[in-house]
Curated annotation (Swiss-Prot):
Small GTPase which cycles between active GTP-bound and inactive GDP-bound states. In its active state, binds to a variety of effector proteins to regulate homeostasis of late endocytic pathway, including endosomal positioning, maturation and secretion. Plays a role in cytotoxic granule exocytosis in lymphocytes. Required for both granule maturation and granule docking and priming at the immunologic synapse. Binds SYTL1, SLAC2B, MYRIP, SYTL3, SYTL4 and SYTL5. Interacts with RPH3A and RPH3A. Binds MLPH and SYTL2. Interacts with UNC13D. Does not interact with the BLOC-3 complex (heterodimer of HPS1 and HPS4). Interacts (GDP-bound form preferentially) with DENND10. SUPFAM superfamilies: P-loop containing nucleoside triphosphate hydrolases. This is Ras-related protein Rab-27A. Changing Q78L: GTP-locked. decreases interaction with DENND10. It comes from Homo sapiens. A lipid is attached at C219, C221 (S-geranylgeranyl cysteine). Changing A152P: In GS2; interferes with melanosome transport. It is a lipid-anchor. It is an enzyme of class 3 (hydrolase).
Amino acid sequence: MSDGDYDYLIKFLALGDSGVGKTSVLYQYTDGKFNSKFITTVGIDFREKRVVYRASGPDGATGRGQRIHLQLWDTAGQERFRSLTTAFFRDAMGFLLLFDLTNEQSFLNVRNWISQLQMHAYCENPDIVLCGNKSDLEDQRVVKEEEAIALAEKYGIPYFETSAANGTNISQAIEMLLDLIMKRMERCVDKSWIPEGVVRSNGHASTDQLSEEKEKGACGC
């Protein structure tokens, strides 16, 4: 796909404590490589990838492929950058929330990150996928899988155990997040909730046209 040759531009935000592997996960997804020498993200950075999304119907059949331009925003996890990070929450449509399976405090802080999202995202119930990263470091693991699953179930969000080192479940986690977003857009008659500048259609309904449907009903956010 050439520049501008897509149906939707969608922004995802990766967040979590410093050192959980956000940059490495996004780099593995976009470039298929692992770089162990990344320095700590200062402020905000992003990567991009083009994908084709095909929704599955109740009968299992897939519809026409939607061309998606993903912007994957990488945020600083340190507290001193928190005000800058939260300023980006409202413009993102989906959130990849990571913790480090070898760092219990990063897991305990997941609740704080979700609280921040509930306060600052485009709605109180945004689409989130929880990732326990560094699953390849099994001998250093301190967070049990059942603990992470229980937390994800408490908030009603999907959970994946990922590894930036070998790529385990990274594509699956991001594809799940994209699927949640596309299904949310499909079922919501009122598209006014969509963060401005995040979703754009080329050759289909414009965001202005989508906003004109406000009087027809609201999205259950």
